Amino acid sequence: MNFYVDVLGCPKNEADCALLKAYLEKKGNNIVNTIEDADAVVIDTCGFILEAKKESIEEILTYLELKKERDLKVYVTGCLVQRYGEELKKEIPEVDGWFGILPPEKIAENIGKESIIPKNPEPVYEFGGRVDEKQYAYVKISDGCDRACSFCTIPLFKGSFKSRKIDDIVKEVEYLILSGKKEIILVAQDTTGYGIDLYGKQMLPELLKRINDIPGDFWIRVMYMHPDHITDEIIEAFSYDKVLKYFDIPVQHGSDKVLKLMNRTKKSEHILKLVEKIRKRYEDAVLRTSIIVGFPGETDEDFEELLDFIKMVRFERLGAFIYSDEEEAPSYHFEGKVPEIVAQERLDILMEEQSKISFEINEKMVGKTFKVLFDEEEEGVLIARSYMDAPEIDGNIFVPGKFEEGFFKVKVTSADVYDLEGKIVEE
């Protein structure tokens, strides 16, 4: 059977589906790159916030419309199924199979046979091959979460924090490097917690050392580091030559009152000291963060504190979102809900401020030369990234040329708010 795999949501889903594709192939199936060539589709869904849930449902319904026109099997997996599986089965009976959070191998074994929605998620898997199309690959080092952020429902459907064995992760990365991957992106709900459940201590520094020791010319990028648990040892581990000086630290807010309501255990002063420590250690550090605006109880004064915080830190990369009121999250019951129109205004103001910061930073890049990877080519223009940018969520460097694999040197010739333009230069 020809399978098309449609990945929605976060990079952790991409990591899961890379393995799922390999297991489907082991069962004698083919993986195709377009739905037109497929006999079956697997949709890996997101169930985190309202917009993601809407997107997942719309995608399912789109494929079911195709199913009316031709012979097409539709299978759905991922967080949305784990969270709402029984309800979905009743509401959308046309789907051929539902699979909650399971090891990819188990999904491949049961697809076409029976639906499986486990009472307790089973997210941790052992490496068994994978199929990737890009020069970069997401590698999931743990799943689930033991944090108790008041806005978040992930622990409810992902379960408690569970780390993969370090040898298995290294084995997967070795496979990826041998297959030609040039960027390894480590993902988890909180990468700083890696290893605590298995080894009794934070093992991210040891994992980075083990991966850094693998022969080859490649990058290591770390995503999703909780600011409360970034130790000096973790910061020092970024000194390994293959580890990018890219610190993805979702701080969520800059007001101490709002941080407390979010059940974040540290205050903004801790974050400021952490940022200072990182920038003192690495002059070329790039800091990325995520912000939630419109959290219940967020006043105009709190938002002004957030703006002042952003102006003070000057994050190189920032993503911001309006609070999503999830019925199973503790914050759902909080008073002081912010009207949507006010939350949108605050988001617009925040992003306008960040756009100024981003443009000022980008202007300083003009004339500099960076080592880059090309992600794709569109009409003779290459979409490149330096160490400063993660795939899909950050900016790009647009370069004239034809796609080639491997690393290249690009000199920046002009800057925009979030993106750069450049030209290939000789080594």
Swiss-Prot record:
Domain of life where this protein originates: Bacteria
Residue span, Radical SAM core domain: 131-360
One Pfam short name: UPF0004
Organism encoding this protein: Thermosipho africanus (strain TCF52B)
Known cofactor(s): [4Fe-4S] cluster
Family: Belongs to the methylthiotransferase family. RimO subfamily.
Catalytic activity: L-aspartate(89)-[ribosomal protein uS12]-hydrogen + (sulfur carrier)-SH + AH2 + 2 S-adenosyl-L-methionine = 3-methylsulfanyl-L-aspartate(89)-[ribosomal protein uS12]-hydrogen + (sulfur carrier)-H + 5'-deoxyadenosine + L-methionine + A + S-adenosyl-L-homocysteine + 2 H(+)
Function: Catalyzes the methylthiolation of an aspartic acid residue of ribosomal protein uS12.
Keyword Transferase in annotation: yes
Gene Ontology BP terms: tRNA modification
UniProt key word Magnesium: no
Location within or outside the cell: Cytoplasm
Annotated positions binding [4Fe-4S] cluster 2: C145, C149, C152
Entry protein name: Ribosomal protein uS12 methylthiotransferase RimO
InterPro entries cross-referenced by the UniProt entry: Elp3/MiaA/NifB-like_rSAM, Methylthiotransferase, Methylthiotransferase_CS, Methylthiotransferase_N, Methylthiotransferase_N_sf, NA-bd_OB-fold, Ribosomal_uS12_MeSTrfase_RimO, rSAM
Gene Ontology, cellular component aspect: cytosol
Cofactor note: Binds 2 [4Fe-4S] clusters. One cluster is coordinated with 3 cysteines and an exchangeable S-adenosyl-L-methionine.
E.C. code: 2.8.4.4
Domain TRAM: 363-426
Residues involved in [4Fe-4S] cluster 1 binding: C10, C46, C79
Keywords tagged on the record: 4Fe-4S, Cytoplasm, Iron, Iron-sulfur, Metal-binding, S-adenosyl-L-methionine, Transferase
Annotated MTTase N-terminal domain residues: 1-116
An example Gene Ontology molecular-function term: metal ion binding
